[in-house]
Structures are given as structure tokens and as C-alpha cells.
């Protein structure tokens, strides 16, 4: 049980790092950021709060390549309003790119896919070919996917990449069937403070 807890809390820490760092990359008001530490602290006790263990070894929470997808000199991101959707809704996104690398990417395009993690069903959007130069933050095309009808909850991976490069990123979104049941008023009970009795 302890191992499952450490794994689950560690995965949550990774997601928190990802959201926080991407927020910094998406801001035009920040010149940079500094992460205090990435490893577990074992000084006066034990604090298993790091992405790496006390010996700077991988704990199995995230691979180095996946970490670089949101913490690097080139970070490709999607901006979207929610991680949770009902079937039939539109998943709308905007492509953002923070490029601190002086190397220019020529004649490349951005590809965005949304894949069902159970069935493998996949949808794809792509931009026109373009040049990517060193810029603090650039905004590119908007796009939309429609969430398919589903009888049970589904998880989708939304993947974005610059074709022909190692620059990529991914997100998980969750889709649920529409809820048609309504809560009847007969099931609601209201208690007034004057009617409550103190049981001693």
C-alpha cells in the first residue's frame, strides 16, 4: 500500500510541476525560473518529495524525455479551457511555442492528435509548413476536436509535436457520457437549526 501511495503522490507531483512550469513558459512577464531541487530530501528525517531519489536516480515517475517535453529550451504547449468534457462537446485548443534555442526549424509543421487510450481511435489536425525562429513565446493556429459519443468514461491523450523533430508534448483529457437523470425534490431534506436536537 505504501508503494502505491508513493507512486500515486509522485505522479501527482509530476503533474503539478508540469502545470507550474508551463504556466511560466506561457507568461511574457517572467524572465525565467529556478527549481529548488529535484531529489528527495533526507537531511533531518525523510521527505520523499523529489522527482528523483536522494542519489539523483530515476524513481519511475517520469522519463527524462518526458520531463524535457515541458522543461527545456524548446517547449511546445497547448492552451485549452478544461481537462473534463461531456461526449459531443468540442475540445478547442491554441498552440503555443516557447523557443529559446537559436537553431531555426525550417519548413516544418505542427501536428496535433487526440487518441482514445483504450480503443486507439485517433483524430489528427496539422498546420501549414512554417519556419520556427528563436522567440520568447509564439502563438500559432487554433484547433478543435469533437469528443465522440461514449457510453462509459474515456481517457484521451492529446499529443502535439513539430513534425520531424524531438519537440513534443502531451496531455490527458477525460470524457464522460451525458447525465440524463435528475435529482427529484422528494429526495432533498432540509433541516432548520430550530428543529435540530442536541443528543447528549
Give the positions of each predicted feature.
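Substrate-binding clefts and catalytic carboxylate motifs of secreted carbohydrate-active enzymes
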Residues: 1-107
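Beta-strand-rich interaction surfaces with strong enrichment in secreted/lumenal proteins
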Residues: 81-83, 127-133, 146-147
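Beta-strand-rich binding/interaction modules
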Residues: 90-130, 140-143, 154-163
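Surface-exposed, short loops/turns at beta-strand junctions within beta-sandwich domains
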Residues: 149-153
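Short, exposed coil/turn segments at beta-strand boundaries within extracellular/luminal domains
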Residues: 164-168
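Low-complexity, Pro/Ser/Thr- and charge-rich linker/hinge segments at domain boundaries
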Residues: 170-188
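Single conserved hydrophobic/aromatic residue that forms the stacking wall/gate
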Residues: 188-199
Amino acid at each position: 500500500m505504501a508503494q502505491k501511495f508513493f507512486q500515486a503522490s509522485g505522479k501527482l507531483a509530476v503533474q503539478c510541476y508540469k502545470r507550474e512550469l508551463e504556466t511560466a513558459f506561457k507568461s511574457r512577464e517572467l524572465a525565467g525560473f529556478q527549481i529548488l531541487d529535484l531529489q528527495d530530501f533526507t537531511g533531518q528525517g525523510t521527505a520523499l518529495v523529489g522527482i528523483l531519489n536522494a542519489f539523483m536516480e530515476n524513481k519511475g515517475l517520469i522519463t527524462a524525455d518526458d520531463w524535457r517535453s515541458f522543461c527545456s529550451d524548446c517547449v511546445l504547449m497547448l492552451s485549452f479551457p478544461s481537462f473534463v468534457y461531456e461526449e459531443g462537446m468540442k475540445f478547442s485548443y491554441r498552440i503555443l511555442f516557447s523557443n529559446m534555442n537559436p537553431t531555426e526549424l525550417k519548413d516544418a509543421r505542427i501536428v496535433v492528435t487526440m487518441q482514445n487510450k483504450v480503443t486507439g481511435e485517433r483524430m489528427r489536425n496539422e498546420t501549414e509548413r512554417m519556419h520556427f525562429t528563436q522567440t520568447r513565446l509564439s502563438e500559432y493556429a487554433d484547433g478543435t476536436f469533437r469528443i465522440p459519443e461514449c457510453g462509459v468514461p474515456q481517457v484521451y491523450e492529446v499529443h502535439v509535436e513539430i513534425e520531424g523533430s524531438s519537440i513534443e508534448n502531451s496531455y490527458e483529457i477525460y470524457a464522460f457520457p451525458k447525465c440524463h437523470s435528475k435529482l427529484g425534490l422528494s429526495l432533498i431534506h432540509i433541516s432548520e437549526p430550530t428543529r435540530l436536537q442536541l443528543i447528549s
